[in-house]
């Protein structure tokens, strides 16, 4: 129970959490979806740590859709077909100091004693890729995505010279039936420089750094473009494997090399923390001797059995950590400070600087966050400023070189009106550091982002309606807001250059858009909820609400307490839902969609038996035949509740590979635990299958 003082500060804590979670999510969007981050790794890590600390102090704020519970790009639209990983593809926790590394090693020692050895490998600054081989043949390649579902980039991956089409069998290591191997796609520095030189010759903009160029090259729609770019890959881990059970990660790497897969030459074993520190210190001094960019050293427990014992959190394994090196710094001239309006109305100032080389790439722009941060840093327009690239990747302004001032510098004045729509700017609540544009309905900047969100993969997943299409529709005044999307006609689309051919006819993409909009009208209710851009409502909360209430009208009519009582929702999301439906123009959007034929009820397939009616089931770990979303939808379709946490009310826990803490909680509470076969029997026959 919270103290009286805590109760009094609860509203302020909630506001602080909402602002922080929103800021983290916006930066995740810019990093994973746009490939155009505006803050440094260090700044993002600090934001995430502040959010984690706040949720640690107030666990009731931690929702399934919180950025602390999600991996990478969860919840954002992508350009390629979604595919499920056979086993979760997690991120890594970071250590920035010797003390943080020692604390991690201490936790390992407390759990497994002196039994662990440590594998040290370079942290390549590239793009994560997962390869699946069946009977030795490459059948799929996919990006990390949200850790469970990634983008299918198989055709592009096949153009990478390091990726074999078939594995080479060996006497010591027979090729396994199924092999899911993880690695990093990157550019060697000389290949990156050659690519940028060719782009400049063609009159195109060069890439800012090798990581961005690797991401852009891997995501080309035309594999021939990818093939012309000299991408490389190094493997650094396993996912789901059938027919091969290595005792150590070191042994797994030997097998990968024997099969013809690329493995780093710079991987070493250490017996203790002192050996780990020696490797970290060595590469800290010699990092620029490597032919590709690195931003640290990854340290992993080598023994596979100990890895299983240590388990993982919802986003990262406990048996591995990435030690990141201190950033590099440079000086340059701050030419101007300009502001940008984000999708939630937050006004962000940006530093525009004389381009300068830092850590191997050219930097000319960086975020300054807000007016308070500019004041804290003490920077003036015209200053010589110190910039750094945390993790050798993303730039940040540290502060001015005061002794170089000549009196011509001037103070930056935050605008009082929105640069997009001219509305007066103000903090949303007293005490907020950020100022916002309150014109949520009419601000072009916010409107563009909302239209884009409607079509996102976790929204209504409407192909063709990407960012460019949304901008074209708004600029041509074909739509006034997202409410008019589903009333679009061929005549409307012909008013835009984007969807009109030179002959004045509707383009192929225009025809596809109309077909896809019509298909989206029949989307499940939870997708409609996500598409409405209700703050904090992601797929998990949307599914829970759709299952509990069955229709959008019932959700709108529910009280905040009723909404909060739904498992997976809680008070923060409930308050956001109530506030959203209290706004007149929000309800107008719902009415427009309803009039256009968008389905507002959660229709159930009557042919599916309700074998799980009244049961609460938790799924943990990776299942072979189900993605996490598939398993949840199978439970809900049969009348059950797919919960996110284990409690005394839980009827069954379904445990796949690497189940984590939910498995331990089930054992502690005596909740029945099913493997995947048991889960299939439960779906088919209900609890009777357990007797």
Swiss-Prot record:
Family indicated by similarity: Belongs to the NAD-dependent DNA ligase family. LigA subfamily.
- So what EC number does this one have? 6.5.1.2
Q: Name one GO biological process term.
A: DNA repair
SUPFAM superfamilies per the record? BRCT domain, DNA ligase/mRNA capping enzyme, catalytic domain, Nucleic acid-binding proteins, RuvA domain 2-like
Single GO MF descriptor: magnesium ion binding
Q: Where is the BRCT domain?
A: 607-691
InterPro entries, per the entry: BRCT_dom (IPR001357), BRCT_dom_sf (IPR036420), DisA/LigA_HHH (IPR041663), DNA_ligase (IPR001679), DNA_ligase_AS (IPR018239), DNA_ligase_CS (IPR033136), DNAligase_adenylation (IPR013839), DNAligase_N (IPR013840)
Query: Which residues does the record give as Zn(2+) binding sites?
Result: 418, 421, 437, 443
Write out the residues that bind NAD(+): 41-45, 91-92, 121, 144, 184, 300, 324
* Role: DNA ligase that catalyzes the formation of phosphodiester linkages between 5'-phosphoryl and 3'-hydroxyl groups in double-stranded DNA using NAD as a coenzyme and as the energy source for the reaction. It is essential for DNA replication and repair of damaged DNA.
By what name is this protein known? Answer: DNA ligase A
Which residues are named in the active-site annotation?
Answer: 123 (n6-amp-lysine intermediate)
Swiss-Prot/TrEMBL keywords: DNA damage, DNA repair, DNA replication, Ligase, Magnesium, Metal-binding, NAD, Zinc
Q: How is its activity regulated?
A: Inhibited by pyridochromanone.
Question: Could you name the Gene Ontology cellular component terms for this entry?
Answer: cytosol; peptidoglycan-based cell wall; plasma membrane
Q: Which cofactor does it need?
A: Mg(2+)
The UniProt subunit note reads as follows:
Monomer.
Question: What is the catalytic activity of this protein?
Answer: NAD(+) + (deoxyribonucleotide)n-3'-hydroxyl + 5'-phospho-(deoxyribonucleotide)m = (deoxyribonucleotide)n+m + AMP + beta-nicotinamide D-nucleotide
């Amino acid at each position: 129970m919270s103290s009286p003082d805590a109760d009094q500060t609860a509203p302020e804590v909630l506001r602080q959490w909402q602002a922080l979670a929103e800021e983290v999510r916006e930066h995740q969007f810019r990093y994973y979806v746009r490939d155009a981050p505006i803050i440094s790794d260090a700044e993002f890590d600090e934001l995430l740590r502040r959010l984690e600390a706040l949720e640690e102090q107030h666990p009731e704020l931690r929702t399934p859709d919180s950025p602390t519970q999600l991996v990478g790009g969860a919840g954002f639209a992508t350009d390629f077909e979604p595919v499920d990983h056979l086993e979760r593809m997690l991120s890594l926790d970071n250590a920035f100091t010797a003390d943080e590394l020692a604390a991690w090693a201490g936790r390992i020692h407390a759990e497994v004693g002196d039994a662990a050895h440590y594998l040290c490998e370079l942290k390549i600054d590239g793009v994560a890729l997962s390869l699946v081989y069946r009977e030795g043949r490459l059948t799929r390649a996919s990006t990390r995505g949200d850790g469970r579902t990634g983008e299918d980039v198989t055709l592009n991956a096949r153009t990478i010279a390091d990726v074999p089409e078939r594995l080479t069998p060996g006497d010591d290591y027979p090729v396994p039936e199924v092999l899911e191997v993880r690695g990093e796609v990157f550019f060697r520095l000389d290949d990156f420089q050659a690519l940028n030189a060719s782009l400049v010759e063609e009159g195109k903009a060069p890439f800012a750094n090798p990581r961005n160029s690797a991401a852009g090259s891997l995501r080309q729609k035309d594999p021939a473009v990818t093939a012309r770019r000299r991408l490389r890959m190094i493997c650094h881990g396993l996912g789901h494997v059938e027919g091969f059970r290595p005792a150590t990660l070191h042994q797994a790497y030997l097998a990968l090399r024997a099969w013809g897969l690329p493995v780093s030459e710079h991987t070493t074993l250490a017996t203790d923390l002192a050996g780990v520190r020696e490797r970290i210190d060595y590469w800290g001094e010699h990092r620029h001797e490597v032919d590709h960019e690195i931003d640290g050293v990854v340290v992993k427990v080598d023994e596979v059995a100990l890895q299983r014992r240590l388990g993982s959190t919802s986003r990262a394994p406990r048996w591995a950590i990435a030690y990141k090196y201190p950033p590099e710094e440079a000086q340059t001239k701050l030419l101007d400070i300009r502001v940008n309006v984000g999708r939630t109305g937050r006004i962000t100032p940006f530093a525009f600087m004389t381009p300068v080389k830092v850590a191997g790439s050219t930097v000319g722009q960086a975020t300054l966050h807000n007016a308070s941060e500019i004041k804290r840093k003490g920077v003036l327009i015209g200053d010589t400023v110190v910039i750094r690239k945390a993790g050798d990747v993303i730039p940040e302004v540290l502060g001015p070189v005061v002794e170089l001032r000549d009196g011509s510098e001037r103070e930056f004045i935050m605008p009082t009106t929105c640069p997009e729509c001219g509305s007066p700017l103000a903090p949303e609540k007293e005490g907020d550091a950020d100022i916002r544009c309150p014109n949520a309905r009419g601000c072009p900047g916010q409107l563009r982002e909302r239209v884009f969100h409607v079509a996102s993969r976790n929204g209504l997943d409407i192909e063709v309606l990407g960012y460019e299409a949304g901008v074209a529709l708004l600029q041509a005044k074909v739509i006034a807001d997202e409410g008019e999307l589903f009333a679009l006609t061929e005549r409307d689309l012909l008013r835009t250059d984007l969807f009109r051919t030179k002959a004045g006819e509707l383009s192929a993409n225009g025809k596809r858009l109309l077909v896809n909009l019509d298909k989206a009208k029949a989307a499940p209710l939870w997708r409609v909820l996500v598409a409405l851009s209700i703050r904090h409502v992601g797929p998990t909360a949307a599914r829970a609400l759709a299952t509990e209430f069955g229709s959008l009208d019932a959700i709108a009519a529910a009280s905040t307490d009723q909404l909060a009582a739904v498992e997976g929702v809680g008070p923060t999301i409930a308050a956001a839902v109530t506030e959203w439906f209290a706004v007149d123009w929000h309800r107008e959007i719902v009415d427009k969609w309803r009039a256009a034929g968008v389905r507002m009820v959660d229709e159930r397939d009557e042919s599916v038996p309700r074998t799980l009616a009244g049961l609460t089931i938790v799924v943990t770990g990776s299942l072979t035949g189900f993605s996490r979303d598939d398993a949840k939808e199978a439970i809900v379709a049969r009348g059950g509740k797919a919960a996110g946490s284990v409690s005394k009310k839980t009827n069954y826990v379904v445990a796949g590979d690497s189940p984590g803490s939910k498995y331990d909680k089930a054992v502690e509470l005596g909740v029945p635990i099913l493997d995947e076969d048991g889960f299939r029997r439960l779906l088919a026959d209900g609890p009777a299958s357990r007797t």
